[in-house]
């Protein structure tokens, strides 16, 4: 597996455990790309759902993917502050087609005051049965929910106070 290069524009593909496509983001600019970490940004990019419907993101977003963690984080810059959407997912993979991961349904929404809500537990339970997630997936995801909430409390990684603003400034250099 290679990794995307700084300044490169890539697609992001989200899959389900059974291999079906879940969602695709048309264009994300890579701000940092290594074997273990990818940071990207997009703004008003087209998103295609599995049923073919499309929509456009409303605000600039900084995307954080790590090869050692079972989650990715999207920091969305809004007037009221930075909101985060955290997807519990497989670590990312990258090939010539796109940056890819498997979405495992659970999400954490983090508000500008750093309070958060765990979302879609019912969807996770349903898909766990339908797609027959192995027990090890449940163990890994629970461990990563704990890890992610610890990062939120500690304002670590993508939740650090200046993280999103710093990477957004870098993104603006590529847009001009």
Curated annotation (Swiss-Prot):
EC number assigned by the record: 3.6.1.15, 3.6.1.6
Protein name: Nucleoside triphosphate/diphosphate phosphatase
Organism: Bacillus mycoides (strain KBAB4)
Keyword Hydrolase: yes
Entries under Pfam families matching the protein: DUF402
Gene3D superfamilies recorded: FomD-like
Annotated keywords: Hydrolase, Magnesium, Metal-binding
Domain of life: Bacteria
Residues that, per the record, bind Mg(2+) 2: 105, 107, 120, 123
């Amino acid at each position: 597996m290679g990794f995307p290069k700084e300044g490169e524009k890539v697609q992001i593909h989200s899959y389900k455990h059974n291999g079906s496509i879940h969602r695709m983001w048309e264009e994300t600019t890579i701000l940092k790309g290594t074997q273990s970490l990818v940071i990207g940004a997009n703004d008003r990019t087209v998103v295609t759902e599995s049923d073919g419907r499309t929509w456009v993101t409303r605000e600039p977003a900084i995307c954080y993917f790590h090869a050692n963690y079972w989650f990715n984080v999207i920091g969305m810059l809004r007037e009221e502050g930075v909101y985060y959407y955290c997807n519990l997912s497989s670590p990312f993979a990258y090939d010539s087609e796109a940056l890819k991961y498997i979405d495992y349904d659970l999400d954490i929404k983090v508000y500008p005051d750093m309070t958060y809500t765990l979302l879609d537990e019912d969807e996770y339970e349903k898909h766990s049965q339908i797609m027959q997630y192995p027990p090890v997936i449940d163990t890994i995801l629970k461990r990563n929910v704990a890890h992610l909430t610890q990062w939120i409390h500690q304002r670590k990684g993508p939740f650090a106070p200046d993280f999103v603003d710093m990477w957004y400034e870098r993104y603006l250099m590529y847009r001009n």
